[in-house]
Amino acid sequence: MPAEGIPQINLDPGAAEGLRVAVISAQWNAEITDKLHAEAIGAARELGASVEDWRVAGALELPVVVAAACKNFDAVIATGCVIEGETEHFRVVCDAVTYGLTRVSLDTGVPIGNGVLTVANHQQAVDRAGGPEAKENKGADSATAAIHAALVLRQIAAVG
C-alpha cells in the first residue's frame, strides 16, 4: 500500500511501446539493490518499453553512467541503496548522488527515475525495495515515474 500523498501514476500495459529505457543499479547492499533492479526492469517491460540494464559498483558511480546512457535512451532508471552509518559519508553520498542525477536529467532533457534509497537502517530499505514483504516498491515506482515523464515529453514535443 502506498504511503499517503504519493501520486498514483496509472499507465496501461504497452503504454511505453517504442520507448528505450535503461536501468542502472549500484551493487552495494545487493540484497536490496537486486530487488530494486529487478522491479524496475519488470515495471518497464510490463509497460512495453525496450529495456537494457547495467550494474555499477556504488551509488557514486550512477550519475556518470546514467549520463552516458542518456545519449541513447528515452528514460533512465537509477537504483541503489545507501544506508546511514556512523559517519558523515552517508550525507555526502546521498547529496552527491541526488544532485548528480538531477543535474544529468536537466542537462540532457532525459527523464531519470531516482530509485536510490537513502535510509536510516536496513529495515527501511527492505520496506521500500519491493517484493512480498515490502510496504513500497521504489524500483517499480521510479521506472513508472521516468516512463511517464518520457511520455509527457513526447506529448509536449508533438504539440510544438
UniProtKB/Swiss-Prot annotation:
Pfam families on file: DMRL_synthase
Residues involved in (2S)-2-hydroxy-3-oxobutyl phosphate binding: E86, T87, R128
BP terms from Gene Ontology: riboflavin biosynthetic process
Enzyme Commission number(s) of this protein: 2.5.1.78
Record-linked InterPro entries: LS, LS/RS, LS/RS_sf
Source organism, top-level taxon: Bacteria
Pathway membership: Cofactor biosynthesis; riboflavin biosynthesis; riboflavin from 2-hydroxy-3-oxobutyl phosphate and 5-amino-6-(D-ribitylamino)uracil: step 1/2
This protein's GO CC annotations: cytosol; riboflavin synthase complex
Active site: residue positions: H89
UniProt: 5-amino-6-(D-ribitylamino)uracil binding residues: W28, A59, L60, E61, C81, V82, I83, N114
Entry-linked Gene3D superfamilies: Lumazine/riboflavin synthase
Signal peptide feature range: none
Described purpose of this protein according to its UniProt entry: Catalyzes the formation of 6,7-dimethyl-8-ribityllumazine by condensation of 5-amino-6-(D-ribitylamino)uracil with 3,4-dihydroxy-2-butanone 4-phosphate. This is the penultimate step in the biosynthesis of riboflavin.
UniProt cross-references to HAMAP family, sorted A to Z: Lumazine_synth
Descriptive protein name: 6,7-dimethyl-8-ribityllumazine synthase
